[in-house]
Amino acid sequence: MSNQKALVIFSGGQDSTTCLIQAIQTYGRENVQAITFRYGQRHAVELERAEWIAQDLGVSQTVLDLSLMRQITHNALMDETAAIETAAIETADNGVPNTFVDGRNALFLLYAAIFAKGQGIRHIIAGVCETDFSGYPDCRGVFVKSMNVTLNLAMDYDFQIHTPLMYLTKAQTWALADEMGVLDYIREQTHTCYKGIVGGCRECPSCILRERGLAECLESKKAV
């Protein structure tokens, strides 16, 4: 795919960094760009990690400001005074966790598509996952497929949205990183914690999923 270009929606977290590295290996570093969104998230470490990783991997990164979202929606990821539901993983079936940002992935895909078309890019890659999605409706395959159709119709352009992690568990995502030879890089350089704690708080839903998946992956490696 060396003659094709790809745009990765990139946050600096485990999933999007795994997708970025996979895209580099698939399309070639010179054909991959990253797009990151400043949407009013409650901590800066996520953006700092994304910038550092993009530079370290030698990938062009564009940062777009969507902080106006603070004016129209309320959630724990954007409100420093809100408590993050640590039991969100277990309670997701009974309601959407308070860390869900209404419209976030829809906006990310929309702005990514606008940017991609201007760059002559058709392939858009997102690290969303339906298997360990913490109850977020915009991480489901049906949503992404719907957005793909909508964007193609809206811009009369043949976008192809790829979600390589969609049906993988966190353990399988770690295993994918291991297969690409970057497990330690992902483990040491990416940021996942909802609370913005470097190294993780080990309490928020994101940290729990990450650590649980890593433990399962490492246990599987030992068993082989």
UniProtKB/Swiss-Prot annotation:
The note on cofactor binding and number reads: Binds 1 zinc ion per subunit.
Q: Per UniProt, what is one GO molecular function of this protein?
A: ATP binding
Top class in the EC scheme: ligase
> Where do the annotations place Zn(2+) binding?
193, 201, 204, 207
Listed binding positions for ATP are: 10-20
Organism superkingdom: Bacteria
For this entry, list what GO says about its biological process: queuosine biosynthetic process
UniProt-listed Enzyme Commission number(s): 6.3.4.20
Its UniProt pathway annotation is: Purine metabolism; 7-cyano-7-deazaguanine biosynthesis
Q: Which reaction does it catalyse?
A: 7-carboxy-7-deazaguanine + NH4(+) + ATP = 7-cyano-7-deazaguanine + ADP + phosphate + H2O + H(+)
What cofactors does this protein use? Zn(2+)
UniProt keyword terms in alphabetical order: ATP-binding, Ligase, Metal-binding, Nucleotide-binding, Queuosine biosynthesis, Zinc
Summary of the function given for this chain in its UniProt record? Catalyzes the ATP-dependent conversion of 7-carboxy-7-deazaguanine (CDG) to 7-cyano-7-deazaguanine (preQ(0)).
**Protein family:** Belongs to the QueC family.
Protein name per UniProt: 7-cyano-7-deazaguanine synthase
